[in-house]
UniProtKB/Swiss-Prot annotation:
SUPFAM superfamilies: Class II aaRS ABD-related, Class II aaRS and biotin synthetases. InterPro entries: aa-tRNA-synth_II, aa-tRNA-synth_II/BPL/LPL, Anticodon-bd, Anticodon-bd_dom_sf, His-tRNA-ligase, HisRS-like_core, HisRS/HisZ, HisZ. The keyword Nucleus does not apply. Belongs to the class-II aminoacyl-tRNA synthetase family. It is found in: Cytoplasm. PROSITE patterns: AA_TRNA_LIGASE_II. This is Histidine--tRNA ligase. NCBIfam families: hisS. Keywords: Aminoacyl-tRNA synthetase, ATP-binding, Cytoplasm, Ligase, Nucleotide-binding, Protein biosynthesis. GO terms for biological process: histidyl-tRNA aminoacylation; L-histidine biosynthetic process. It catalyses: tRNA(His) + L-histidine + ATP = L-histidyl-tRNA(His) + AMP + diphosphate + H(+). It comes from the Archaea. One of its GO terms (cellular component) is cytoplasm.
Amino acid sequence: MTKFETVRGMKDYIGIDAEKIRYLESTFRDLAIKYGYSEIITPVVEEFKLFALKGGEELRETMYVFKDKADRELSLRPEITPSVARAYIQNLQSSPKPIRLFYFGTVYRYDEPQYGRYREFRQAGIEMIGDSSILADLEVLDLLYNFYDKLNLSNDITIKINNIGIFRKIMDKYNIEDNLQEHILHLIDKNKINEALDILEKNLKNKDIIDFFYKILTKKDTKLEDIESLAELEEVSRLDIKSEFLYLFRLSRILSDLNIKFKIDLGFVRGLAYYTGLIFEVLHPSVQFSIAGGGRYDKLIELYGGLPSPAIGFAIGVERTLLVIKDLKVEEPVNVIVIGMSEDTIPSMFMVSRILRKEEYKVVINTKDQPLSKLLPYYASQGFKVAIIIGKQELEKNMITVRNLITRKQISVPLENIEDAIKQTL
């Protein structure tokens, strides 16, 4: 006999585990809407090139890629930002800017499964397209911080930030081609600093610049005053990157004023190849990996064939975020079981259930053919708090019995008083 199980790296979420995911989704959705963002739902399947073009080395190696019956090369989305960029070009390019969009969906990567890493997982994210200002960057970071504040995690998390534009500008100045830039940044992301510096040395042939790269790549915990000092260095002016340091200084100063906990890491880069400026990740002390991340990608829209449009966004790892929440208590409605004692009571069972569901109770109708003495302890063990018992003789008098399955307190009341009776027994 054939036995089917979940595909390796994927998981079923049942009951409370599914409810936790939905709770995070609704919390994020409500917050994003309050910030003025509109929801976007994009297909799970896109053209392979959409992600391969600027996804970065690691992402390309872990994509689920296949050909359809028309011999088109397609992919399950490994992230959602490129899909939003494609949808923007296709549907929203002529709309007033900036465009604010949020999403929640599954993504797929053929990684080696381990703690905090799955082959199917969920991302909640936002994208702001058409605004290059520091206010846009601050809004995105503020939304991200406030999401974790809603989960009572804001005191525990740290947002790690950097400006990848520092590296980009230097490499652009010395005409290092995009593919090589991508590879160098990939090595830095994997903490292979010496390999990255070796490649830079071969291409730049300038020891002063290599020394400067080493200096900033190894400066992990940078203070605000350090950024201001670096901006005044002669080599910074010579490399035309003073504005990139001053931007980081301005952003950091305002984040401090907003009481957002962050740290500057000049050696930090992100693996996705489309980032051009601000980059950031959310860290939590209980895990070794980031639980959210994002950045500015000012050239991606144009690369996809759209008009030049600055953009910034982030993605939250939903499952990873759940791992760091110790006691997430999802508020559940009161569970009510409706038990009819004869066939004559069936219409009343459904009528009572309709009334209670309108009042946000979670109502189940008993389908078991067992005596009441067995049903009551069974449903108590299943988490039901209240039983509505409808007997034939009671019904003739328009009466029902409401029983608290925990305290065993019960009262008989007229049918129209059912809601008050439930509150009275709880």
